[in-house]
Swiss-Prot record:
ZnF (Dof-type) ranges: 41-95
Subcellular compartments: Nucleus
UniProt-listed InterPro entries: Dof, Znf_Dof
GO MF annotation, one: zinc ion binding
Gene designation per UniProt: DOF5.7
Primary role: Transcription factor that binds specifically to a 5'-AA[AG]G-3' consensus core sequence.
Protein name listed in UniProt: Dof zinc finger protein DOF5.7
Region (Disordered): 1-42, 92-111, 257-294
Residues reported to bind Zn(2+): 43, 46, 68, 71
Transmembrane feature ranges: none
Organism: Arabidopsis thaliana (Mouse-ear cress)
Length: 316
């Protein structure tokens, strides 16, 4: 008899269990099902299925945070509902500020007029109109030039066109103007000095222009003398007087007829009194000329004669 027929069948060997004691292996649901459940959640406020998963609060899987797109609010599962105001979670686009169209437009006529008027007012503050002239020239006060009256409150230059050829020629009197400028009183004491032109209107106008040009030259010369006196002092006053330029017109206007040698020359009656004023040098020259009248060296041009030459010896 064979021994192989009565052997028992072997028992199956059990598989070893690799589970660690004290721990239990839990099966996680698939991620697809979890995402589907999270997407199917409805908003607890508006019951809108239009929700989305944001993140896990405090990194805890039990507190997922969702956002409702319809009511724009957040909520957390297992937590309190937050009272988030409507529209608080959206980002509003900033509107670009359009440039003001009024800035590009030209100013109106009224604004431009106000602008130019303000400019004129500012310029008048720095450059006031010449109302009065206050010059102190060689001790002569030329204040209140507005009181200058020529031809008895009449204009010196009549620039209006003369239509008729037979119009009467008006005399041009510069006496009051010369009296105010320190050249003597011509209206009261010396009446024959009024310049009267006979002829056409062009001659009258030309003579008046020449008169004013002569006065302008004299005033300019006096200004130069004052500036030279201020710069170099009073020591060079005599030399400056000697270098005085000759004016073009009306320099030797005779005030008193002193051509006769027999008549004594008085102080202040010389023919250039209105030009030089009361100058001490002039008076000395006039008195010297009066004393040397008998010696044949009487000079009427204001230059002192050399009479005392006897003490000089002749050359060998």
């Amino acid at each position: 008899m064979s021994s192989h027929t009565n052997l028992p069948s072997p028992k199956p060997v059990p598989k070893p269990d690799h589970r660690i004691s004290g721990t239990s292996q839990t099966k996680k649901p698939p991620s697809s099902s979890v995402a589907q459940d999270q997407q199917n959640l409805k908003c607890p406020r508006c019951n809108s299925p239009n929700t989305k998963f944001c993140y896990y609060n405090n990194y805890s899987l039990s507190q997922p945070r969702h956002f409702c797109k319809s009511c724009r609010r957040y909520w957390t599962r297992g937590g309190a509902l937050r009272n988030v105001p409507i529209g608080g979670g959206c980002r509003k686009t900033k509107k670009s500020i359009k440039p003001n169209s009024s800035m590009n437009t030209l100013p109106s006529s009224s604004s431009s007029q106000r602008f130019f008027s303000s400019i004129m007012e500012d310029s008048s503050k720095f450059f006031p109109p010449p109302t009065t002239m206050d010059f102190q020239l060689a001790g002569l006060s030329l204040n209140k030039m507005n009181d200058l009256q020529l031809l008895n409150n009449q204009e010196v230059l009549d620039l209006r066109p003369m239509m008729s050829s037979g119009r009467e020629n008006t005399p041009v009197d510069v006496g009051s103007g010369l009296s105010l400028m320190g050249f003597g009183d011509f209206n009261n004491n010396h009446s024959p000095t009024g310049f009267t032109t006979a002829g056409a209107s062009d001659g009258n106008l030309a003579s008046s222009i020449e008169t004013l040009s002569c006065l302008n030259q004299d005033l300019h010369w006096r200004l130069q003398q004052q500036r030279m006196a201020m710069l170099f002092g009073n020591s060079k006053e005599e030399t400056v007087v000697v270098e005085r330029p000759q004016p073009i017109l009306y320099r030797n206007l005779e005030i008193v007829n002193s051509s006769s040698p027999s008549s004594p020359t008085k102080k202040g009656d010389n023919q250039t009194e209105w030009y030089f004023g009361n100058n001490s040098d002039n008076e000395g020259v006039i008195s010297n000329n009066a004393n040397t009248g008998g010696g044949g060296s009487e000079w009427n041009n204001g230059i002192q004669a050399w009479t005392d030459l006897n003490h000089y010896n002749a050359l060998p």
